[in-house]
Design a protein with these regions (language model features):
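The conserved 3'-phosphoadenosine-5'-phosphosulfate
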Residues: 61-63, 148, 173-245
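A cross-taxonomic marker for long C-terminal extensions/tails that follow the last structured domain
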Residues: 246-251
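Glycine-rich, flexible loop/turn motifs
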Residues: 53, 122, 212-215
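Generic signal for short, ordered secondary-structure residues
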Residues: 20-24, 30, 105, 149, ...
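PAPS-dependent sulfotransferase catalytic domain
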Residues: 87-179, 187-188, 192-210
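PAPS-dependent sulfotransferase catalytic core
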Residues: 1-87, 220-223
Length: 251
């Protein structure tokens, strides 16, 4: 995977070298974690003719991450350039301390705006990740027939602990950095909330407002037992951990 990242880095550098660099009027980072609604928000933002939203550019290691970002933004057209950065990618590519410096450089020195994606219920977020991995599909554009899965309780508890570590990391690296916070449960579960969110984000990014078409469907049911075959056993196991407080919001 590292070789693929280095090859992509070299390709982007060559394109930036021979092409005329594009200068955007606005730039932003979408920062957070998987299963926080970032793909849904990306699909809505990309419906603006002004926005050119790049992907997770650090999902593979690169040798010169700061220059890589400059090259990526240089080859993208459009008035607004954005890219997605997951917190584990920041940790893996930069380390925590340099990750803080990197985010500060982007926001304070280079004029990037930061959209912070988060989810209040860590258990629901982890369930969603497990089910997406099981189905081999992270997002759907139409309704689907759902099949059930059996979750490894030990693996699930381990992922909850890893998720808590990322909670602390995100809190740490964002200290002192202005950001627009998007909470999945508040802003992305209902269509009316999504429309309101888009109006506020357009204002934050200083672009004309628009009404997006909602194209993606949730792949998991609201009833956990509909897609987790051993939910009763998993629920009991979670209830004996420090994550038991998240169970109150789960149907």
């Amino acid at each position: 995977q590292n070789f693929g990242g280095y090859a992509r880095e070299a390709y982007v550098a060559s394109k930036a070298l021979v092409g005329k660099p594009n200068k955007q009027n606005s730039k932003f980072i979408m920062f957070g974690r998987g299963r926080s609604g970032s793909t849904l928000l990306t699909s809505m933002l990309n419906q603006s003719k002004l926005v050119n939203f790049d992907k997770e550019i650090y999902n593979r290691s690169v040798l010169f991450p700061r220059q890589f970002l400059k090259n990526r933004s240089a080859i993208y057209s459009g008035d607004v350039y954005g890219f997605k950065l997951l917190s584990y990618q920041l940790r893996n590519q930069f380390g925590v301390e340099d990750g803080k410096v990197f985010l500060n450089e982007l926001v304070q020195d280079q004029g990037y705006k930061l959209i912070y994606m988060k989810r209040e219920n860590l258990v629901k977020q982890t369930l969603s990740k497990h089910y997406a991995r099981f189905r081999g599909s992270w997002h759907e554009s139409k309704k689907v027939n759902r099949t059930k899965m059996i979750v490894s309780i030990q693996d699930f508890i381990h992922e909850l602990n890893e998720g808590r570590k990322l909670d602390f990391l995100e809190e740490d690296v964002l200290v002192g950095i202005p950001n627009f916070e998007v909470i999945y449960e508040r802003d992305l579960e209902e269509n009316d909330a999504k429309i309101k969110l888009m109006l506020n984000i357009c204002e934050f990014l200083e672009i004309p407002t628009f009404r997006p078409e909602i194209k993606l469907e949730k792949i998991s049911s609201k009833q956990v037992a509909d897609y987790i075959d051993n939910w009763s056993e998993l629920e009991q196991a979670i209830g004996k951990t420090k994550f038991s407080n998240f169970l109150a919001d789960i149907e």
